[in-house]
């Protein structure tokens, strides 16, 4: 009888959590409003500094990691919202996770930096700072290191407990048209201007050949024959073909800088390259052929300060997409796995406050 009573209580608690989260998901504006700058000022005053230190240490060894962390935040937010779901290595419901899906694997990077930051934060303030917030802080710090752009990050996100590879269809592929880009961003409550502004992140980082291969090779022939996408400069296409020969496959580990001029500097060079036919992706070229987008490209190409101001604002706006706050979600103890049920069922504990002391080291499951 006692066993049945315990089971009933457990089911009731689980249903309460599900109901609470369902209610939060129905009230996205309310959740966004709960994010605030300085969220950890009392509960973990050094949280942002610890994340900054982890990012700076990684950047000192590899400047390219900054682009990876910026992209990590984007890919997190566009699938299920900014909830750290892209970090999960195991899907509690079974099946492949976002992290393993083709848009993310093998190109997405920065997971080790997030883990290092989480370890440092947990040592200082156990069970307090979410992985989703760490991702947002790390992206901001990466932008600061590469572009001397600083902005404050509203925090208070909770970590999600679901990660499905199939949902990565929400990520805009490099083959996107102007209309599909507009639609994908609109679905996340981001405007055409936000989309053009955020596309400027392509001024840092690298890409695998597979993302642009069909712009320079005709794959309908065997062997593939050279072509030049109308949106590409012939000389740039020739350079890309030399880098990625016709026998390149989806898994060939060859990459090229998305901005060949200043690949590790967050500047407005991306917008200057587009009119010259040097946008690496088909989707990049779409920004210069669509009149509304082309006007924005021209504006940002001539005014880097304007673009950086708008980029910072757009990053903050993106960081509010479908967030979980309050008692929804959880404060994940290990960014790669969801918490044990003992801890996660304690939904009354709000992020930023002290968690129950009942959970010990078992919360740090191996990822």
UniProtKB/Swiss-Prot annotation:
The record marks 71 as: Transition state stabilizer. Its cofactor is heme b; Ca(2+). GO terms for biological process: hydrogen peroxide catabolic process; response to oxidative stress; response to stress. Its EC number is 1.11.1.7. Glycans are attached at residues 164, 218, 247, 303. Keywords: Calcium, Disulfide bond, Glycoprotein, Heme, Hydrogen peroxide, Iron, Metal-binding, Oxidoreductase, Peroxidase, Pyrrolidone carboxylic acid, Secreted, Signal, Vacuole. Ca(2+) 1 binds at residues 76, 79, 81, 83, 85. GO terms for molecular function: heme binding; lactoperoxidase activity; metal ion binding; peroxidase activity. Belongs to the peroxidase family. Classical plant (class III) peroxidase subfamily. This is Peroxidase 1. It comes from Zea mays (Maize).
């Amino acid at each position: 009888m006692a066993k049945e009573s315990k089971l009933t209580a457990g089911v009731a608690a689980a249903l309460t959590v599900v109901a609470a989260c369902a209610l939060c998901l129905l009230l996205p504006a309310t959740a966004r409003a709960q994010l605030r700058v300085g969220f950890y000022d009392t509960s973990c005053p050094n949280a942002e500094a610890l994340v900054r230190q982890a990012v700076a240490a990684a950047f000192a060894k590899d400047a390219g990691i900054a682009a990876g962390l910026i992209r990590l935040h984007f890919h997190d937010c566009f699938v299920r919202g900014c909830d750290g779901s892209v970090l999960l290595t195991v899907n509690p419901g079974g099946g492949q996770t976002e992290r393993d899906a083709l848009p993310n694997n093998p190109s997405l990077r920065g997971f080790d930096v997030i883990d290092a930051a989480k370890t440092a934060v947990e040592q200082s303030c156990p069970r307090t700072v979410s992985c989703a917030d760490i991702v947002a802080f790390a992206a901001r710090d990466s932008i600061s290191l590469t572009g001397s752009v600083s902005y404050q990050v509203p925090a208070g996100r909770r970590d999600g407990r679901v990660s499905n590879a199939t949902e990565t269809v929400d990520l805009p592929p490099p083959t996107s048209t102007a209309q599909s880009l507009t639609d994908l961003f609109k679905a996340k409550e981001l405007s055409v201007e936000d989309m053009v502004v955020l596309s400027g992140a392509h001024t840092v980082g690298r890409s695998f050949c597979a993302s642009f291969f069909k712009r320079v090779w005709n794959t309908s022939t065997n062997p593939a024959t050279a072509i030049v996408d109308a949106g590409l400069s012939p000389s740039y296409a020739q350079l890309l073909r030399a880098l990625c020969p016709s026998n390149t496959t989806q898994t060939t580990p060859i990459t090229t800088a998305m901005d060949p001029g200043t690949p590790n500097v967050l500047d407005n060079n991306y917008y200057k390259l587009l009119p010259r036919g040097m946008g690496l992706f088909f989707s990049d070229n779409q920004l210069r052929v669509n009149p509304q987008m082309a006007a924005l490209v021209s504006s940002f190409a001539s005014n880097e300060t304007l673009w950086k101001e708008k980029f910072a604002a757009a990053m903050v706006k993106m960081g509010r997409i479908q967030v979980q706050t309050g008692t929804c979600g959880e404060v994940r103890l290990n960014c790669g796995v969801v918490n044990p049920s003992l801890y996660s069922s304690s939904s009354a504990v709000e992020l930023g406050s002290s968690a129950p002391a009942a959970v010990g080291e078992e919360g740090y499951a191996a990822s």
